[in-house]
Amino acid sequence: EEVGDAVKNIKVGDKVIISCVSKCCTCDNCKIQLYSHCRNGGWILGYMIDGTQAEYVRTPYADNSLVPLPDNVNEEVALLLSDALPTAHEIGVQYGDVKPGDTVFIAGAGPVGMSALLTAQLYSPAAIIVCDMDENRLKLAKELGATHTINPASGDVSKQVAAIVDEDGVDCAIEAAGIPATWNMCQDIVKPGGHIA
């Protein structure tokens, strides 16, 4: 309904995706595309200022931090493009160094975990194991490409993972639930020299 005086590329009525990272595009970190480390923005939405799950949002550096949404893109699909999907891809899959032939474990099958499942498949891992307490989420994970699913209520997760891969553990463990128990679980099932993201 309103754009600030400094905004030149976005006009009232435009459909946009709000990047979860605000970027000034002028600082040293932005110049080398480390936008999450922007000296003037970065991860400020939801931390330093109000977040974006609201009807009205103030977006710093709007010309750089808003992406126009083409009319032919479904708004429900676009919702994932602003936070869950890029977070899962960068922080989970890329930082987890997923490579072809790897074994990947994802702790948590919520929006970030499912997004990690989808984006990990871009790297052709040999196996993707998704772990969650919710059977409906595990069923969906299988439909979306998980090779294996584990419900921790069914027994020792480490033993179940070892039966799927080998006793050394997985190449990459992605923690997508945000609780201490799943962080510990990831440490228990990753192989020596593997990655936890």
Predicted regions and their residues:
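ADP-ribose/adenylate-binding Rossmann-like module
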Residues: D188-A197
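Glycine-rich beta-strand-centered segment in the early N-terminal region that forms part
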Residues: E1-D28, P70-N72
